[in-house]
């Protein structure tokens, strides 16, 4: 079922309409373990009387790589100054972060705190991570958020067969769609297309036709040749990790299928059919066939560069900034950098950039439906090394770092008075960077000579601030971004969240054994279909057979058996 979205723009409070309904269970805060040698509490700064060191993993993104200053004078030093906790950082390249933490967990050498985890399922059966749900009664900030925003139904979706969950997720008051598509509005207008009118009811098919017209215009003006592609996207190649990344995720959701980044943890594109009350594989459905035909049409007709699915993000961005392409993916963190890069290369006044509410397919659903996002695991090594009381102290520090308003603001904006302060705009008290600062991570641009607080000190990085209330998660939104979310509310809908089948450890292990090669096969075939290496009509049956040979039917059968058993 779908829920229509209406919009209230006061502080983007429209987003509260995304909140899912459910039971009224309350998180119980027992507080029956005395805090010896440290202070903690709901919106109380965690502080250890004696210096303490906790190890933590770090997903290091090349486009804002961790610098020594982050530890000596930036975010990590700020945390230590406030809490007396020194974070011993083990840094892994973001491209193979999951593989590296997997190796560390399996070898017993994992850090105590493991953030930036999207899918905890591969780590549960081995016993290398703690069932964190056993400790949430010691987490006052986490528990207060769960109670205030009725998060228990959402948390139920990540519980395992044993009734526990092993990842402390980022929790949103409301689901927010981050990734979308932006275009060179000036070129669309010159070609005779009003993108602001088109987006009100456009589809991927109609976008295809519009782009054919835009390319025809560009060829006539000598801006490109018939052999050139006018769309060469990012977050699909190296960062897409062989799945098609962001583009196939948002496009796939438009056709009620799982693809791209969404494929991770899906056991082969498994979705729930609410009419039949059973699970099926969307990856071998007619919807999937429709989706890849549409995606392929962009490549086949000379619009979308097949290098989209192999190139680095920098290459894709440079093609757009130099004017070789006129459409690409973006998100809130990238918008200001996109604007600044176009201004630097093309010159102010020589372009118009428009961030769209991306097209629909057979539905108008946004790709994001869950109020949960990536989160934090705690290793069994931490419990073994620290003992129960020491581990609970660690848990209370994590509660402050990831769930308190104070730490959220610090990790996102930096210290008040150093990088930002409050200002009053139209009678509203808002956060604003101080003169001389900008931040790509917040979508706040500036001069070339301004200091980017993410690059310099590590604020607004992707490792440590997740979720929170709508007011907090949108406190950096520019008027343009607020306008985008208003248009989402007008033109898009949100699908209900699928229920979860909760396998036992043995069942999970079996599903993983089947799912890994199956998903690799699905991803490989999908990219071959889209790039034209395989013919969708003549090779479709071979593709479906290959999925059956890799146990897609067994996965569906076992998933439905698990779900039937838990819903008796």
What are these regions (language model features)?
Residues 1-8:
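Bacterial N-terminal signal peptides that target proteins for export
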Residues 8-568:
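Extracytoplasmic/secretory soluble proteins
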């Amino acid at each position: 079922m779908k829920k229509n979205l209406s919009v209230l723009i006061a502080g983007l409070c429209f987003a509260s309409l995304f909140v899912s309904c459910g039971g009224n269970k309350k998180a119980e805060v027992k507080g029956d373990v005395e805090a010896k040698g440290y202070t903690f509490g709901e919106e109380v700064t965690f502080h250890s009387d004696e210096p303490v060191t906790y190890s933590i993993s770090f997903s290091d993104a090349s486009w804002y790589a961790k610098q020594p200053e982050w530890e000596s004078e930036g975010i990590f030093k700020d945390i230590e100054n406030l809490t007396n906790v020194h974070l011993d950082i083990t840094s892994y390249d973001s491209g193979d972060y999951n593989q590296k933490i997997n190796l560390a967990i399996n070898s017993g050498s994992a850090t105590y705190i493991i953030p930036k985890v999207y899918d905890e399922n591969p780590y549960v059966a081995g016993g290398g991570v703690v069932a964190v749900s056993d400790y949430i009664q010691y987490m006052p900030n986490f528990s207060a958020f769960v109670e205030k925003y009725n998060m228990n139904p959402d948390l139920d979706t990540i519980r395992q067969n044993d009734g526990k969950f092993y990842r402390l997720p980022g929790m949103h008051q409301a689901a927010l769609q981050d990734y979308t598509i932006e275009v060179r509005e000036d070129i669309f207008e010159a070609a005779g297309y009003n993108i602001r009118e088109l987006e009100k009811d456009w589809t991927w098919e109609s976008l295809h036709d519009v782009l054919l017209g835009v390319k025809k215009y560009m060829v006539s003006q000598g801006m490109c040749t018939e052999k050139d592609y006018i769309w060469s996207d990012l977050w699909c190649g190296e960062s897409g990790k062989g799945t098609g990344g962001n583009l196939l995720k948002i496009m796939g959701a438009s056709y009620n299928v799982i693809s791209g980044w969404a494929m991770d943890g899906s056991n082969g594109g498994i979705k729930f059919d609410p009419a039949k009350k059973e699970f099926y594989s969307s990856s071998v459905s007619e919807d999937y066939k429709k989706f890849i035909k549409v995606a392929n049409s962009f490549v086949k007709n000379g619009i979308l560069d097949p290098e989209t699915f192999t190139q680095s993000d920098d290459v894709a961005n440079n093609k757009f900034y130099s004017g070789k392409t006129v459409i690409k993916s973006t998100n809130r963190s990238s918008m200001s950098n996109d604007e600044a890069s176009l201004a630097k290369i093309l010159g102010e006044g020589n372009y118009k950039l428009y961030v769209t509410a991306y097209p629909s397919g057979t539905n108008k659903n946004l790709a994001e439906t869950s109020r949960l996002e990536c989160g934090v695991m705690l290793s069994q090594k931490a419990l073994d090394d620290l003992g129960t009381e020491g581990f609970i102290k660690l848990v209370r520090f994590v509660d402050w770092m990831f769930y308190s308003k104070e730490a959220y603001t610090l990790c996102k904006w930096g210290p008040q008075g150093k990088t930002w302060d409050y200002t009053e705009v139209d009678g509203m008290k808002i956060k604003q960077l101080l003169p001389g600062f900008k931040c790509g991570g917040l979508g706040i641009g500036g001069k070339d000579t301004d200091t980017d607080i993410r690059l310099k000190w590590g604020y607004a990085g992707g490792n440590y601030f997740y979720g929170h209330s709508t007011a907090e998660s949108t406190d950096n939104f520019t008027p343009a971004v607020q306008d985008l979310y208003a248009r989402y509310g007008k033109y898009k809908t949100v699908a209900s969240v699928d229920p979860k089948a909760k396998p036992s450890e043995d069942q999970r292990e079996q599903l993983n054994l089947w799912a890994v090669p199956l998903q690799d096969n699905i991803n490989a075939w999908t990219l071959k279909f889209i790039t034209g290496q395989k013919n969708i009509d003549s090779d479709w049956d071979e593709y479906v057979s290959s999925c059956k040979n890799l146990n897609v039917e067994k996965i569906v059968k076992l998933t439905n058996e698990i779900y039937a058993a838990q819903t008796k």
